[in-house]
Amino acid sequence: LREGKRALLLVEHFSNMDLPALCYLLDHCGKDFGPELSKRIVAIAGMKLNEANPMVKAWAEGFTRIVIYPSRSLASITDPAELEKESAKSRAINMASMRALDRCKKEGNAVLVFPSGTRYRPGVPETREGLREIDSYLRLFDVMLLVSTNGNCLRINPDAPEDMLADLVYEDVVIMSASPVLNCKEFRAQAMAEAPEDMEDKKPFVVAK
């Protein structure tokens, strides 16, 4: 960032405490660069955080973020009229988010993305898989950090998985580990080269790497 490079953080997503925990660790354990990086993080957030509940929205607004309309949200709509309406809404929101994303990069911020686009749910392995849109982020940024998380103190309530206010608080140790700084272009090129030659759409393969 100090050299003017566009930086991307790809972070595992287990709970709504992931971003606060990362910022806390950067502020308190990040040596000379941590507090500066913490202040420069802009998170990509699904609109669910804005619409699920006023309390959830208020809590989310404590962090700088860009709101998007996730593509997987359209997949569950079966009514044609509703799909057309939501598709138009999706395009408007995501066009605005792309302009905001471009502005953030130019201002020297680090953009944080949760590759799965949702919190991981035990027993639902697809919630841990990266979305194919992550390939587009790799093409938009110069360098990236991959951040893994072990431990979770705010867990999804199995009896109310869609209600964020019903999340269960646990005492736990949360350890976040970061990769070395990776060159996005080189990473993507290597992944593309490793993909099977007969694979038509290589984006999911790149994201899975």
Give the residues covered by each predicted segment.
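Secondary-structure boundary elements
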Residues: 28-37, 96, 102-110, 139-140
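A Trp-anchored, charged/polar loop motif used as the substrate-binding/catalytic surface
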Residues: 89-103, 128
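Catalytic core of membrane glycerolipid acyltransferases/transacylases, capturing the structured
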Residues: 7-86
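Conserved acidic residues
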Residues: 6-7, 142
